[in-house]
């Protein structure tokens, strides 16, 4: 089966909807790939979803390489995009390229994603020039949560929307192969989608984008009843299913139902009789 590449994703502009989700380890990558994901994002959301932090600012390049490598070991058909964490692309173009290269060389990613508009163009230029495909990210950019004053929809005012459209055009000029639009009014996302020649992938940006992405734990209902944003639609409730399964296991342990004879390794009778004979030794307890 052909592995998805960044040029293949770019060529999907205006075509079949792009299917994207996150994965942070080997088993979730296998699940996402079996389900037919076109893109697997190893997101910095691993900080919240897997590691229990309050925001995405707590992970560094080492953490992202670790989780990206786990996803890559699943050898998915999907394109693996490694998220560049906070402060890994803010200092200089040279440092940005080196950090992106770590996600590719050590992590096994085939592309990287970074947040921001025109002020990130110099960094994107450098990474693209190093022949590493870049996915852009506009709108509600979680790494800017402190500057934005929280997780708020972006582009609701006309001037802010105009600036976002200009940012999208600048990202395309810098060489991105796609753009994630997060927490953006649907009409603004539609304008950007119509304006740029690369696919847009929405998360809380309406149905008019070229594709959609949701965090895999949100889709599967693995949050255990935690708050979900308005744009999330759970398609399962695996957290409750998992609790029920473990409760049944613990009940079976307590009552002695588990393990059964079929779930137990057995010694041949002949060997057992020999072992009983050895029990006459003073060093072996009698049984």
Where are these regions (language model features)?
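Alpha/beta enzyme core
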Residues: 2-236, 240-274, 278-287
């Amino acid at each position: 089966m052909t592995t998805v590449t960044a040029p293949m994703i770019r060529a999907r502009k205006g075509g079949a909807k792009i299917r994207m989700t996150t994965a942070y380890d080997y088993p979730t990558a296998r699940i996402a790939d079996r389900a037919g994901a076109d893109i697997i994002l190893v997101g910095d959301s691993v900080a919240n979803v897997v590691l229990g932090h309050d925001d995405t600012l707590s992970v560094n390049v080492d953490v992202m390489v670790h989780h990206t490598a786990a996803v890559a070991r699943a050898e998915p058909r999907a394109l693996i995009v490694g998220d560049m964490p906070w402060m890994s692309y803010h200092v200089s173009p040279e440092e940005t390229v080196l950090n992106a290269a770590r996600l590719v060389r050590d992590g096994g990613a085939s592309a990287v994603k970074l947040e921001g508009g025109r002020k990130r163009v110099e960094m994107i230029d450098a990474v693209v020039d190093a022949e590493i495909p870049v996915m852009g990210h506009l709108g509600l950019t979680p790494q800017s949560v402190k500057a934005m004053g929280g997780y708020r929809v972006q582009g609701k005012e006309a001037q802010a929307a105009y600036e976002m459209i200009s940012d999208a055009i600048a990202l395309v000029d810098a060489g991105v192969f796609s753009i994630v639009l997060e927490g953006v009014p649907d009409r603004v996302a539609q304008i950007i989608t119509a304006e740029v020649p690369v696919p847009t992938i929405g998360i809380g940006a309406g149905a008019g984008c070229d594709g959609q992405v949701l965090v895999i734990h949100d889709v599967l209902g693995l949050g255990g009843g935690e708050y979900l944003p308005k744009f999330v639609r759970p398609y399962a409730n695996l957290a409750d299913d998992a609790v029920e399964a473990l409760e049944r296991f613990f009940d079976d342990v307590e009552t002695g139902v588990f393990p059964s004879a079929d779930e137990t390794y057995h010694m041949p009778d002949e060997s057992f009789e020999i072992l009983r004979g050895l029990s006459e030794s003073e060093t072996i307890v009698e049984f």
